[in-house]
Amino acid sequence: MSHTAEIPMVPGSESPLELKPLKAVDPKTVYHRRAQRLLSLAKDSPLADYFELCRRVVAIQARLAAEADFGQLLAWGKDEAIPLSHLGSEADSYWQGLLQQLLSDLLPQVDEDMARVLRLLMQQSPEQLTSWGSALRQGHMSEVPARFSLFIWAAMGVYWSHWAPMVIKRIDQRKVVQQNLCPICGCHPVASVIVDQPRAGLRYLHCSLCESEWHYIRAHCTSCGQDKGTTLWSFDDAKAQVRIESCDECHGYTKMLFVEKSPLMDVAADDLATLMLDSELNAKGFGATTVNPLLLAHETEQ
């Protein structure tokens, strides 16, 4: 349950072919489809056990997205470039409440080793959780114990993804400029997605936290913005559904998921399922400039 009546609506164009700088998604749908995709991909994965853990976490996210009480949208910077980047301490209280619900639901579904991890996380102080949450959102993954990151991010994701669509409807998208971080919450993308709506071949970056998508011109590095020295890699098939775009300028890379060719793909699940592509690019001296909510690698591990 939530309240948004106090936020004025900004009218937009009605053209179905208009290029939308921002695309809102329904978090319930995203989490439900992600859980299904994880279940499907686990069948042929050497990481089947981890895929199953992630599936259970995402399934709980879907339930929380549908049933949790999110209160009222807190003061947000509608005049700021990134409106949901600084929500204050009340937001911490809400996502930490979601975290406790997530851990309680997950506890009976895991083995004893993982249960000990969950119980330890449940015992952390609000101040500690606030510090860890802030570090993760700022990309400082190494400041948070790796065994806790998946669950903290999952809880924050439920909260931020709930409010993002409502904020997107209420900002002037004409002021949104191309950028490498999410224009709504300021977090890194998971990967690029190539879509067929409103026009075929458009690229959007998909946010790792609030699940929003924002347009980004193809053949430009999604990290440094350079339009020279980018290479599109495809290791087995030139028309593969997952490819990688690397940049010779900053030596970063991002995956490109051609969801127009395979609508069942999910940006987080399919990124996780193609870690061998990351290994290939790492061996060539490139590093990921993205964040996967299901695999929050420490900076030194990227």
Curated annotation (Swiss-Prot):
Coarsely, its chief localization is: cytoplasm
Q: Where, per UniProt, does this protein localize? A: Cytoplasm
Q: Could you tell me what this protein does? A: Necessary for formate dehydrogenase activity.
Please, one GO biological process term? protein maturation
Source organism: Shewanella sp. (strain MR-4)
Its name, as the record gives it, is Protein FdhE homolog
The record's section on HAMAP family has:
FdeH
Query: What Pfam families does UniProt report for this protein, alphabetically?
Result: FdhE_C, FdhE_central, FdhE_N
Gene name as annotated: fdhE
Q: What Gene3D superfamilies does the entry give?
A: FdhE-like domain
Q: What is the lineage of its organism?
A: Bacteria, Pseudomonadati, Pseudomonadota, Gammaproteobacteria, Alteromonadales
